[in-house]
């Protein structure tokens, strides 16, 4: 990614050993050497959040929360301001109340503040955050502590017009995952579909958006390096 000239990136950690300081500091050096900035961190443990953070078994929460403290510390070392959280699935075996969910999320927010990072709710299909109404209630509950990662493809998968979601949360969005689409395909490299990126950039500029944009697509079936190079050139040509 850095070799292609990208100046903004997200680090997706893949295992706990990558959270150790020597590894994280090497990542930071790699970014600095290329004049790039790490905007965000994505935990590898997103699939476990339902059972280990947003569930009532306290001992499991106590044992697991340290992993997120390490992610927040790693984000701080990288200079990243955002940590991406999926949260709980939409239907849990033991469904917790929204207030319980919001309180647990608030506990993550407080840990993030100690490292100077925003703990952000991403909109994700099949998770509670797939619902705009849920996100509105979360915003009301958390107030100024509510920060959001907006994902274009996830908005589509949740059944929404991405521009509706972006407009509703434009003042709370601190980070954006970009992808292209067509009526038939919901996730494509930017420039390969019909999504109106210029409209999105204009909307966020008008809202005085200070966050960044990263491309998030799934690599299966793509010549990744060539597609990223193409998408970078395409997006650079239309950014306002």
For the regions a protein language model found, what residue spans apply to each?
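Short acidic/polar active-site loop segments enriched in Thr and Asp
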Residues: 7, 37, 81, 174, ...
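Acidic/histidine-rich catalytic cores of soluble enzymes
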Residues: 8-9, 41, 107-197
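Charged helix-capping and loop-helix junction motifs
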Residues: 22-26, 61, 65-68, 97-106, ...
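Short acidic/histidine-rich active-site segments
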Residues: 212-217
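N-terminal pre-domain/capping segments
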Residues: 1-76, 113, 144-147, 171, ...
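Active-site acidic/histidine proton-transfer and metal-coordination neighborhood
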Residues: 50-147
């Amino acid at each position: 990614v850095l070799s292609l000239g990208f100046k903004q990136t997200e680090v997706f950690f893949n295992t706990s050993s990558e959270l150790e300081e020597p590894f994280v500091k090497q990542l930071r050096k790699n970014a600095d050497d290329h004049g790039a900035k790490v905007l965000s961190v994505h935990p590898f443990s997103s699939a476990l959040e339902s059972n280990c953070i947003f569930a009532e078994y306290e001992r499991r929460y106590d044992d697991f929360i340290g992993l997120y403290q390490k992610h927040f510390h790693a984000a701080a070392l990288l200079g990243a301001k955002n940590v991406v959280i999926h949260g709980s699935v939409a239907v849990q075996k033991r469904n917790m109340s929204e207030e319980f969910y919001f309180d647990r999320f608030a506990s993550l927010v407080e840990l993030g503040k100690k490292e100077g990072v925003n703990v952000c709710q991403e909109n994700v299909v099949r998770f509670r955050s797939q619902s705009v109404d849920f996100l509105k209630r979360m915003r009301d509950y958390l107030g100024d502590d509510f920060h959001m990662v907006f994902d274009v493809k996830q908005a589509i998968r949740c059944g929404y017009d991405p521009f509706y979601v972006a407009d509703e949360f434009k003042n709370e969005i601190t980070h954006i995952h970009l992808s292209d689409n067509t009526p038939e395909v919901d996730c494509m490299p930017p420039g390969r579909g019909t999504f109106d990126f210029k409209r999105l950039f204009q909307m966020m500029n008008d809202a005085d958006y200070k966050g960044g944009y990263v491309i998030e697509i799934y690599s299966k079936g793509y010549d990744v390096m060539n597609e990223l190079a193409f998408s970078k050139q395409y997006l650079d040509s239309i950014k306002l």
